[in-house]
């Protein structure tokens, strides 16, 4: 009788696991998805992709008011380099940005074009919007 009950319990547990939909990790952790065009901005796109792969967040929580302070924090101690911009990920406009951001030297045309593109994409999103970045 005990073996039969244990078998029944095990079968019920397996059946329950198969029938209950599994939660998709991170499914509710963002509000919008932004598909960043790697072919259009290859240096900035590669930087974003690499920084995310190294453990930096792929989510940007928009906070425009704090951008200047976070930019100062993220670029502190990173010298300027003639002919290059310092690109940071997470971006300064993101709550996740600031001290500890990944910084890479990229050409100004790529960096500023990418910044303009992202700004246009997110212009209608209010502060607090959580944007998932996917580089493709």
UniProtKB/Swiss-Prot annotation:
Species in which this protein is naturally found: Bacillus subtilis (strain 168)
GO annotation terms (biological process): sporulation resulting in formation of a cellular spore
Gene name for this UniProt entry: nucB
GO cellular component: extracellular region
Similarity-based family: To B.subtilis NucA/ComI.
Signal peptide: 1-28
Alphabetized UniProt keyword annotations: Hydrolase, Manganese, Nuclease, Secreted, Signal, Sporulation
Keyword RNA-binding recorded: no
Required cofactor names: Mn(2+)
EC numbers: 3.-.-.-
Region (Disordered): 63-88
Role of this protein: Degrades both double-stranded linear and covalently closed circular DNA. Likely to play a scavenging role in order to supply nutrients under starvation conditions.
Cofactor binding note: Mn(2+) ion stimulates activity.
Protein name in UniProt: Sporulation-specific extracellular nuclease
Coiled coil segments of this chain: none
Main location: secreted
Basic and acidic residues compositional bias, start-end: 63-75
GO molecular function: nuclease activity
Localization, UniProt: Secreted
